[in-house]
Amino acid sequence: MDLADQPMMTAIKPAPANIMILLDDSDSMTFEVLAADYNEGRFPNPAGDEQDGYSYIFENAGDNAFLDDIRYMGQAGRKLWKSQSHTHNVLYYNPEIAYDPWPSYGNQDFLPADRKFPKLHPFKKNAGAMDLDGESFSVTLELEALPDAVLPVKNAHYFQQTENGVIYLVVLDGDENKTNYFAITEVEGSGMTEKIRKVRSVTTPPGKIRVEEYGQARQNFANWFTYHRRREYVAKG
């Protein structure tokens, strides 16, 4: 009697696997925020209830799912610094991640974003662009031995917090072609709705905060803005 060296079932080749890819196309996929433990991941609005949370950080570009003003942070809302910190809003720019353009396909190429005016949408030709050196909001700037001044904060910025709790505003300044750093010296409110009131300039921030090469960081921020700013962009990219 001859016995097989392997079970008969192992000789049967299964059919190729069927893989179904489902892409969420709900309205919330246009959101620019994703905050844990809040309604639909919106960012809490201190002037409203949970249903009125912010959906968008940047100004209305005309192609968002929601157009009512209450969904947009505006200059006052952008003083809620945690909305522009990847630690609290996981969609926002993270300086430790390299943001690449979308993969090209067919005749469609996705090039590095413009460092001054990155497009609002990866492939919609009439979607417009954002001036990264435009004003996002303004805040009081403390000056040593001088009266306080007003600091216009540019769109190309983000916040980071050190282990000892110091909050830093990092501005990738395209007009000066360098990175500027500011320590937050005064806030109001608490929790997710903590709002910055005053900052002071810092020349030597801690190593975790310091940007090694301005040009690369500016390009990385521009790429994030065009290709990774929204929930849908992350899913498609």
Which residues does each PLM region occupy?
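Extended N-terminal export/anchoring regions of large proteins
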Residues: 1-237
